[in-house]
Structure formats: C-alpha cells, structure tokens
Amino acid sequence: MTEVGVIGGTGFQPGLPERRRTVFTPYGTVRVDITRVGDHRVYFINRHGKGHDLPPHRINYRAIVWAMRELGVKRILATNSVGVINSDEYEPGDIVLPVDFLDFTKRRPTTFYDEKVVHVDVTEPYCPELREALLKAADDLGYTVKEGAVYVATEGPRFETPAEIRAFRKLGGDIVGMTGFPEVVLARELEICYASVCLCTNYAAGIDDRRRTIDEVFELVEELRPKAVELIERCIEYIPPKRSCPCSQALEGAEV
C-alpha cells in the first residue's frame, strides 16, 4: 500500500473519507483528512484552512510538510491555482505540470535547516516519477496535461503588476502563483517526492486587458476541480511502490 499526501484547497480531497486526525509538529498543529483511493491511504491537508481563511503568505508551510513526514508520507501531490504568463504556450483552463520554479517570495520561512548548514540540490525540483505517473493518468483519462512550465512564486496576497509579469517572462517564467513555494523545497529537504498540478485560472496582469478579480479565479477553479481530483486519484494508482528517483537521496552530500 502506497501512502500519499495531497495538499490543496477546499474541495480537492481525493478518495473516500475515513477519518480526521490532528498532527502535532514543531511548527504547529495540522488537521489532516485521511481517505482511501483503491488500496492506497491518502492524507489530505487543506493549506488555506477551514473556510479558506489563510492567505498565501500566512500559510504554515513547514507545519504542513512536516506533518506529512510524521505520517510516513514519501510522495506529495499538490494542486495550485496559477495565472498564465506565457500565453504562447498556455491559456486559462489548462492543467500544467511545472518542472522548475523562480522564487520571488519575501517573508515566509523556506527551510527546516536554520540551525545547521544544509544545501539541498534542486536541479530537478519536481519529482520525475510523480510527473510521469500524472502524465500516464492524464493519458488514461483522455485529459490534456501540459508539462515543462517554469512556476513563478510570488508573496501575495496582492496580484502581480504588469511590470513584474514582464520581468518574470524575460526570466523564463511561464505561470505565476502564490502557494507553490516553499512546499516544493521543504519536501525535498525531507527527501519527500513532490509534484504540482497547476490549474491555469486567468491571464496574469498585462497579458490581456482585463482586471484581475478573485471571483474569476474561483469560478475557473470550480470548473477544473473535478478533473484535477480525478487526475490525482488515477495518478495514485500509477505511483510505483518503491522509489527510484533522486528525491529519496536529496540529503546525501548536502550537509556541511
């Protein structure tokens, strides 16, 4: 039986619910919904909390990822809402698997290693095995899922300016969001595989002439949510029992 963690927003819980558990971590308590997909146990954490009351810059990312570790999770699948920067390749309604990121967050804690020196390698930040499983699941379901994007992480809670988006585009950014970082790095620091399923909900500022509103974001999230949940559920069936990716040896040679 593979134990999988899923981090997402309200309504993204996969599988059949079984029970709820509170996990105590050095960084705070985390409420976890335990579900089952086939023979696999799934631990779901709503990163925004009950009622979506936590903005992106106040989410306790370290507690969330540490809770997954406490539960014995070795694979994490996350969902993230994003805006489209590279309109030549992506558009609202797309589901995208990022392969790299640019970090433009400012104040949130981004590491577990404040007391010792650890330089974890993130040459391939998103687990290749999980991405492959997601692509197999998409093919099985007949869904179009695009891979290869560079995710730009911003602090929030405000949307980005057109000037920022132009700069991100020049730096190679394809999509932009507020919740995908530092989860990806925190997972790597604990040698947990991590992949993100990004839901393109709108064009970023300046890409079109429309004003950004949270209503349009939530509207498209609701449209994409059933497909994303089904994709994750099918992906879980394709995850191999044993890991052969570099994520499981991320700390080898990393500590000074």
From Swiss-Prot:
GO molecular function: S-methyl-5-thioadenosine phosphorylase activity
GO biological process: L-methionine salvage from methylthioadenosine; purine ribonucleoside salvage
Reactions listed under catalytic activity: S-methyl-5'-thioinosine + phosphate = 5-(methylsulfanyl)-alpha-D-ribose 1-phosphate + hypoxanthine
Enzyme class: transferase
Site (Important for substrate specificity) residue list: E160, I214
Known EC number: 2.4.2.44
Keyword Transferase: yes
A Gene Ontology cellular-component term: cytosol
Sites where the protein binds substrate: M178, N202, Y203, A204
Entry keyword set: Glycosyltransferase, Purine salvage, Transferase
CDD domains for this protein: MTAP_SsMTAPII_like_MTIP
Residues bound to phosphate: T10, R47, H48, T179
Pathway as given in its UniProt record: Purine metabolism; purine nucleoside salvage
InterPro entries: MTAP, Nucleoside_phosphorylase_d, Nucleoside_phosphorylase_sf
Anything else known: Although this enzyme belongs to the family of MTA phosphorylases based on sequence homology, it has been shown that conserved amino acid substitutions in the substrate binding pocket convert the substrate specificity of this enzyme from 6-aminopurines to 6-oxopurines.
PANTHER family per the UniProt record, alphabetical: S-METHYL-5'-THIOADENOSINE PHOSPHORYLASE
Homology family: Belongs to the PNP/MTAP phosphorylase family. MTAP subfamily.
HAMAP family assigned: MTAP (MF_01963)
Subunit structure: Homotrimer.
Function recorded in the entry: Catalyzes the reversible phosphorylation of S-methyl-5'-thioinosine (MTI) to hypoxanthine and 5-methylthioribose-1-phosphate. Involved in the breakdown of S-methyl-5'-thioadenosine (MTA), a major by-product of polyamine biosynthesis. Catabolism of (MTA) occurs via deamination to MTI and phosphorolysis to hypoxanthine.
Name of the protein this chain belongs to: Probable S-methyl-5'-thioinosine phosphorylase
Organism: Methanopyrus kandleri (strain AV19 / DSM 6324 / JCM 9639 / NBRC 100938)
Source lineage: Archaea, Methanobacteriati, Methanobacteriota, Methanomada group, Methanopyri
